[in-house]
């Protein structure tokens, strides 16, 4: 395969149009490194990390296979970088959903929980990497080594904002959400043991139903009544969690 011109935006896969790339960002022709990440996002979401073939991504883009090593060191490095991008987008999508919800404490919390379900569903096979790290130890080790600080920051910010949502439901108010967590906020929220317990319960509950919905639980996936009522069951579960606060 000959060397590509730097201004060559064509690819052997004709489906990789400007419109395709706009699914991922506002750039209709992102840099090649980002294109590799975006195709990896799709491939792992669809087939899971074990069946991911980085050579297929390169072939779709019309680049040589060693380009993965050039940008990411190796296949696992590519998966680690992409896993962080997926996690970052997942967390931010939760709060985009809250921002779009009506200014009502219950509706904002429900928006967060529903987005947890929806985003985890879109995440697909990435759930195995992010929720069950032992299934991809090398990938998660690289991810932790490269992005541990950023992951911790996102995790703490997500829980801090969720604590505010939960507290708002109990008080019947709507509070502004911080753009980032600082030591003062961390200390303030950490001192409210009752809220911390409720936040943990809400977060675990939302993740549980999200993983169940995405994973197509082997036993219940074959029960027609469960399939037909899936959305209603999730809605009832979310209502129950919120009503118990």
How would you label these PLM feature ranges?
Residues 20-25, 82-111:
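Amphipathic alpha-helical linker/stalk segments
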Residues 1-31:
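N-terminal intrinsically disordered/low-complexity leader segments
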Residues 33-34, 54, 76, 106, ...:
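Short, structured helix-loop boundary elements
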Residues 32-35, 39, 43-77, 81:
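Helix-turn-helix
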Residues 91-96, 107, 128-132, 137-200, ...:
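Amphipathic alpha-helical packing segments from all-alpha helical-bundle domains
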Residues 35, 39-47, 89, 93-100, ...:
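Solvent-exposed, amphipathic alpha-helical segments
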Residues 32, 75, 82, 86, ...:
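Hydrophobic/aromatic residues within well-ordered alpha-helical segments
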